[in-house]
């Protein structure tokens, strides 16, 4: 992945090289701290009470949400991953940061939307839950909306983007599985996704290209998310 194109985030997110270096260091530091599973939630009334910022990882089933949580935290089995779409079936909370000390973040690994190899009723139930959570969670500071770089933005992703625009919930597009594409294909999908994202009011202008497998883009995403940590 050495020839991954530089994502626009690098230029736009930081005003100069010094600021970029500081942000990257802060991201590496925070994501090297303790990260522990807090709880899995199957309904809105069981979401945890806390005073940290929440970052949610949303996207179609199998796009690589749980793998991204593992890559960010440098842990292989923190969040359970699988080849079978529909692996994650609860809102899984992970607390990142030093114990009883700031800065810290709550990361929420969501079930996927779209096709899943699970009973229809279960898929319907968790899809309703994800949408209600995304629309109405005050602690939610940023949604990382994951898009498989081989497929680009699909119609059900657009539905979620429109819903987040209407609810004024800040979200950032993260392209996943970049290791599966050639550099020219990544440049192409990135251009299309950036152009479409620019039309959405609640979308962060920077689109980050990642691979949980090769580690591409992971440090950059760490830097951006660490900036949202509480306090
Ligand atoms: N090549 C490659 N495979 C990946 C990458 N990220 C995830 N995968 C694979 O994609 C599959 C799905 O990954 P998960 O992380 O379980 O995806 P998910 O979005 O959490 O899936 P659900 O919980 O079922 O919605 C697994 O087989 C992963 O190994 C990546 O960056 N590169
Ligand atoms: Mg998952």
From Swiss-Prot:
GO cellular component: cytosol
Described function: Necessary for normal cell division and for the maintenance of normal septation.
The protein's name: Probable GTP-binding protein EngB
GO molecular function, a single term: GTP binding
Binding site for GTP: 59-66, 86-90, 109-112, 176-179, 210-212
Organism expressing this protein natively: Rhodospirillum rubrum (strain ATCC 11170 / ATH 1.1.1 / DSM 467 / LMG 4362 / NCIMB 8255 / S1)
Cofactor dependence: Mg(2+)
Residue positions binding Mg(2+): 66, 88
Pfam families hit by this protein: MMR_HSR1
Similarity remark: Belongs to the TRAFAC class TrmE-Era-EngA-EngB-Septin-like GTPase superfamily. EngB GTPase family.
InterPro entries, A to Z: G_ENGB_dom (IPR030393), GTP-bd (IPR006073), GTP-bd_ribosome_bio_YsxC (IPR019987), P-loop_NTPase (IPR027417)
A GO biological-process term: division septum assembly
Residue ranges occupied by any EngB-type G domain in the UniProt entry: 51-231
UniProtKB keywords: Cell cycle, Cell division, GTP-binding, Magnesium, Metal-binding, Nucleotide-binding, Septation
Cited SUPFAM superfamilies: P-loop containing nucleoside triphosphate hydrolases (SSF52540)
């Amino acid at each position: 992945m050495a020839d991954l194109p530089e994502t626009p985030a690098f230029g736009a997110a930081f005003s100069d090289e010094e600021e970029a270096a500081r942000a990257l260091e802060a991201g590496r530091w925070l994501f090297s701290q303790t990260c522990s599973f807090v709880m899995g939630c199957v309904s809105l009334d069981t979401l945890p009470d806390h005073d940290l910022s929440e970052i949610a990882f949303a996207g179609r089933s199998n796009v690589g949400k749980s793998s991204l949580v593992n890559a960010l935290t440098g842990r292989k089995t923190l969040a359970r991953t699988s080849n079978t779409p529909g692996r994650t079936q609860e809102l899984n909370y992970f607390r990142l940061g030093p114990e009883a000390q700031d800065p810290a973040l709550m990361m929420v690994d969501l079930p996927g939307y779209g096709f899943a190899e699970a009973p229809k009723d279960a898929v319907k139930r968790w899809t309703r839950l994800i949408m209600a959570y995304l629309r109405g969670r005050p602690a939610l500071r940023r949604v990382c909306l994951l898009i498989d770089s081989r497929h680009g933005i699909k119609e059900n992703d657009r539905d979620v983007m429109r819903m987040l625009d209407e609810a004024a919930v800040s979200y950032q597009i993260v392209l996943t599985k970049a290791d599966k594409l050639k550099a020219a294909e990544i440049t192409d999908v990135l251009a299309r996704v950036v152009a479409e994202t620019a039309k959405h009011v609640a979308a962060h202008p920077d689109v980050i290209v990642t691979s949980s497998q090769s580690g591409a883009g992971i440090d950059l995403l760490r830097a951006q998310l660490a900036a949202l940590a509480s306090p």
